[in-house]
């Protein structure tokens, strides 16, 4: 489960044991090919030039729901991972997108 804080696009991820970890949304996008939305997260408080692991998930945004809780889904296929990695590479290598 993810709980979103509107300030600075902070998201709290809760694991199976109930531990909460704070992340910041790097960006999100929708893929017409897979008809899914994706969100990429980095640890909150990371420095801009710091090398960090980026977490990626699929999610279903609900435009009519004001809830700040939503479900994240694992990306399961290799093809989806390749697409997400390609979008991330484009984001990281294009100064105009940051």
Curated annotation (Swiss-Prot):
Highest taxon of the lineage: Bacteria
Pfam families in alphabetical order: DUF1292
InterPro entries xrefs: UPF0473
Stored PANTHER family: UPF0473 PROTEIN CBO2561/CLC_2432, UPF0473 PROTEIN CBO2561_CLC_2432
Family: Belongs to the UPF0473 family.
Protein name: UPF0473 protein LSL_1108
């Amino acid at each position: 489960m993810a709980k979103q804080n509107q300030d600075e696009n902070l998201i709290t991820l809760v694991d199976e044991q109930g531990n909460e970890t704070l992340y910041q949304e790097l960006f999100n996008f929708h893929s017409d090919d897979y008809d899914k939305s994706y969100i990429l997260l980095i640890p909150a408080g990371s420095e801009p030039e710091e090398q960090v692991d980026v977490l990626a998930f699929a999610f279903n945004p609900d435009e009519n729901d004001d809830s700040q809780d939503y479900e994240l889904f694992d990306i399961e296929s290799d093809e989806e991972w390749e697409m997400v990695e390609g979008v991330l590479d484009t984001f990281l290598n294009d100064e105009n997108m940051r």
